[in-house]
């Protein structure tokens, strides 16, 4: 979906297809047919933006087969779909029964991460619409927080530098500018905007021409970051926000109550990691690596609100006594695109947890899932039009 900002520029809104974790190219094409096109039809749009997730095997196929890449581009066009952004964070296996910490491998100290991201950039340059010259890719924020050590930290920065050089060559050869954004996430080496600034302004850091940050509003909320402060931190350091992921975290205002913890327990599922945080009265953020840890006697204080890294549908907050952090989403979006110029032009709704919601809220067939995704996009659309942006067809 495209929107015209009051300054005349185009802002793109998409939904991320990692909610349909296809591992190979046939699976990707099935996603377009069974989900993405039906979502577009539900919204009554001639064109819908999607943020493709391409697992390792699908990406390797497309890079190695120009005919397959052209066919995918043609199918996107025929189904009324367009791609200006990719989710490059999960490498493969995102549909596994247990993902948890596996999603952080390979990290930026490993060659596979660099090669995969390079492949994604080449693919995106070929998939961009004819009238679009800028693409974005979100990626792992270096690594899980296990201390990198100086040698591994140097290797990660070196890999990002090589990527920046490759993106410059791609830009010169294709005329398309592909930028990659580290996506700060609770529990990782880069958890916050301040962490990202520290990494991307350190000696040996890559040029900001092609390497920046992807802001995820669920992650900001989970870490109790103030959106304005986070954005100011990046802008003051000259770090571009190449993309923003529109998402909401799970919020428990009074976790000391038994009924609240019982409600939270319904979200403590085995597939994904649900980092949980609280902020003490003196502003210190404490947390656990997973919700289940917080619910047992983990030492996490119950005297202040908890927030959990569980992406809940934007339009459908959980039932009381729980809530979601759409207030953080609204504040971030107002700052990102509500000013005189947009601070990013790529927005992506990312709720990959539909299949792991409590049973009463979970869509039990493809039709209901498409309904839910369309409702989320309609919610995001309304937020944008309330900020003065106007819908525009491709």
Task: Please tell me what each predicted stretch does.
Residues 25-33, 62-66, 151, 156-167, ...:
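Distinct, well-ordered alpha-helical segments
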Residues 286-389:
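Flexible, acidic glycine-rich loops studded with aromatic residues
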Residues 167-292, 303, 312:
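Acidic/histidine-rich catalytic cores of soluble enzymes
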Residues 11-17, 46-52, 82-87, 133-139, ...:
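Hydrophobic faces of well-ordered beta-strands that scaffold small-molecule active sites
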Residues 2-5, 97-212:
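Active-site acidic/histidine proton-transfer and metal-coordination neighborhood
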Residues 21-30, 54-68, 145, 187-191, ...:
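Acidic-and-aromatic substrate-binding clefts and catalytic sites of carbohydrate-active enzymes
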């Amino acid at each position: 979906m495209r929107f015209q900002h009051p300054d005349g520029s185009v802002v793109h809104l998409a939904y991320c297809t990692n909610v349909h974790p296809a591992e190979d190219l046939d699976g990707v094409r099935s996603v377009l047919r069974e989900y993405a096109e039906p979502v577009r039809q539900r919204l009554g749009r001639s064109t819908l933006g999607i943020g493709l997730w391409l697992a390792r095997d699908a990406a390797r196929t497309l890079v190695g087969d120009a005919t397959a890449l052209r066919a995918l581009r043609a199918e996107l066009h025929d189904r009324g779909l367009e791609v200006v952004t990719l989710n490059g964070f999960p490498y493969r296996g995102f549909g596994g029964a247990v993902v948890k910490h596996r999603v952080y491998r390979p990290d930026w100290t490993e060659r596979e991460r660099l090669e995969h991201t390079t492949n994604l950039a080449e693919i995106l340059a070929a998939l961009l619409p004819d009238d679009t010259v800028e693409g974005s890719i979100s990626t792992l924020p270096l690594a899980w927080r296990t201390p990198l050590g100086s040698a591994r930290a140097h290797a990660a920065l070196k890999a990002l530098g090589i990527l920046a050089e490759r993106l410059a060559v791609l830009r010169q050869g294709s005329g398309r500018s592909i930028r990659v954004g580290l996506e700060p996430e609770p529990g990782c080496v880069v958890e916050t905007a301040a962490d990202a600034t520290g990494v991307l302004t350190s000696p040996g850091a890559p040029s900001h021409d092609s390497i920046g940050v992807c802001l995820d509003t669920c992650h900001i909320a989970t870490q109790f970051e103030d959106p304005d402060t986070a954005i100011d931190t990046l802008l003051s350091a000259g770090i571009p926000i190449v993309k923003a992921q529109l998402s909401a975290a799970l919020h428990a205002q009074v976790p000391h109550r038994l009924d609240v913890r019982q409600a939270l327990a319904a979200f403590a599922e085995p597939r994904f990691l649900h980092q949980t945080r609280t902020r003490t009265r003196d502003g210190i953020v404490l947390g656990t690596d997973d919700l289940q840890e917080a619910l047992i006697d983990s030492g996490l204080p119950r005297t202040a609100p908890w927030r959990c890294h569980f992406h809940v549908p934007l339009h459908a907050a959980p039932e009381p006594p729980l809530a979601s952090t759409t207030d953080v989403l609204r504040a971030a979006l107002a700052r990102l695109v509500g000013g005189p110029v947009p601070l990013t032009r790529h927005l992506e709704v990312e709720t990959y947890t539909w299949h792991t919601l409590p049973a009463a809220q979970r869509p039990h067939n493809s039709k209901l899932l498409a309904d839910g995704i369309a409702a989320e996009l309609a919610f995001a659309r309304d937020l944008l039009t309330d900020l003065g942006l106007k819908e525009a067809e491709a």
